């Protein structure tokens, strides 16, 4: 379906000749695996955020796994996090043997609620992992105060929010370690890859150790007492990411223009929850254009709208399937009804196409198609 010229994709990377030239130069070089281009990408990304260290990795999942290992997280340790999250990130908790403790979210922002997290702290709790859902920053001051009060590590999932700002500071600057993802539908992409940032030199050293050996060390047969991963980013991916980083302001500005069209056309869409921006948030760069339907819409009505959009060749998936309702996490004892706000939000959310290649006519068509479908499902007026 992606090859259909009439298909309107959820995401479409903003690639210019700068990216093509950067990758071509690496392909013409003697090294395409991890090397100097990765080093440059790390340095420039750390400078962009104002953080001391950045460690490039093969994916955000691997990045969080390395972060947890760098902290010495062991089987049985508890990590408090949200079920309304990019599931690849939360999976990292399970993959290192730790226990994900899922808590409910704020109805308007989708962010992890500090008081809900506080109620789940036990002697086994080691860290809080909070995200910036779909680009909206969490309440980082409250989360930092909670973590400090209980001696916990604060980890930041910034996979959905590059460029967003909370009280004047960029996301990615609030966690003891913060994780970014550079795969679609993110604004900055490098195919597949991620970045972990920190200001702690010990944690940075541990991240690099657990990430695995660089090219010059791969011929050594020595094995240390702790076995590392092999989670390096290649110079090819780093070249693409570096070129994207240099154009990030331009990329985000294009997406803001598309957002303005959506906001204009969505005004006449009866029955949706308006986009929310918390008072302490200065700037938001959405990962997708997320539509929150009112409570008169059922989950099945939302799914019918998704199907109608698909029939019209519009990629607009449900957003999202909460972790506690997925089979594996059910085996940990979670059940439907445990996180009522998460379920209420997730049952009525869908993500509309959002990228810089959309024009105003296409946005108008997407919104009108969704509106027509909402009328057909007979949901009636909005109740939030």
Per-region residue spans from a language model:
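Short beta-strand->loop structural element characteristic of the AMP-binding/adenylate-forming
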Residues: 99-109, 317
């Amino acid at each position: 379906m992606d090859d259909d010229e009439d298909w309107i994709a959820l995401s479409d990377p903003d690639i210019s000749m700068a990216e093509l030239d950067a990758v071509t130069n690496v392909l013409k070089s003697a090294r395409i695996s991890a090397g100097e281009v990765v080093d440059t990408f790390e340095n420039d990304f750390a400078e962009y955020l104002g953080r001391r260290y950045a460690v490039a990795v093969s994916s955000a999942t691997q990045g969080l796994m390395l972060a947890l290992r760098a902290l010495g997280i062991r089987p049985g340790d508890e990590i408090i996090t949200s079920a309304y999250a990019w599931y690849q990130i939360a999976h990292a908790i399970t993959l290192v043997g730790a226990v994900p403790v899922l808590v409910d979210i704020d109805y308007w922002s989708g962010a992890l609620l500090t008081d809900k997290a506080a109620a789940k702290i036990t002697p086994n709790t080691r860290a809080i992992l909070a995200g910036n859902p779909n680009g909206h920053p969490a309440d980082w001051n409250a989360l930092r105060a909670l973590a400090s009060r209980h001696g916990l590590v604060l980890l930041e999932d910034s996979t959905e929010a590059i460029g967003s700002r909370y009280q004047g500071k960029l996301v990615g600057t609030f966690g003891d370690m913060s994780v970014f993802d550079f795969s679609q539908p993110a604004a900055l992409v490098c195919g597949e890859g991620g970045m972990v940032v920190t200001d702690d030199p010990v944690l940075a050293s541990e991240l690099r150790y657990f990430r695995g050996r660089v090219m010059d060390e791969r011929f050594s047969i020595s094995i240390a007492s702790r076995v590392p991963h092999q989670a390096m980013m290649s110079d090819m991916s780093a070249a693409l990411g570096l070129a994207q980083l240099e154009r990030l302001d331009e990329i985000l500005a294009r997406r803001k223009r598309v957002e303005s069209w959506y906001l204009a056309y969505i005004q006449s869409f009866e029955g949706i929850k308006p986009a929310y921006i918390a008072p302490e948030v200065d700037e938001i760069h959405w990962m997708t254009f997320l539509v929150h339907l009112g409570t008169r819409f059922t989950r099945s009505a939302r799914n019918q709208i998704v199907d109608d959009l698909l029939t019209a060749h519009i990629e607009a998936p449900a957003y999202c399937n909460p972790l506690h309702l997925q089979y594996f996490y059910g085996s940990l004892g979670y059940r439907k009804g445990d996180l009522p706000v998460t379920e209420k939000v997730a049952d009525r959310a869908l993500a509309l196409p959002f990228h810089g290649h959309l024009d105003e006519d296409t946005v108008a068509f997407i919104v009108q198609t969704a509106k027509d479908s909402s009328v057909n499902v007979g949901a009636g007026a909005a109740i939030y």
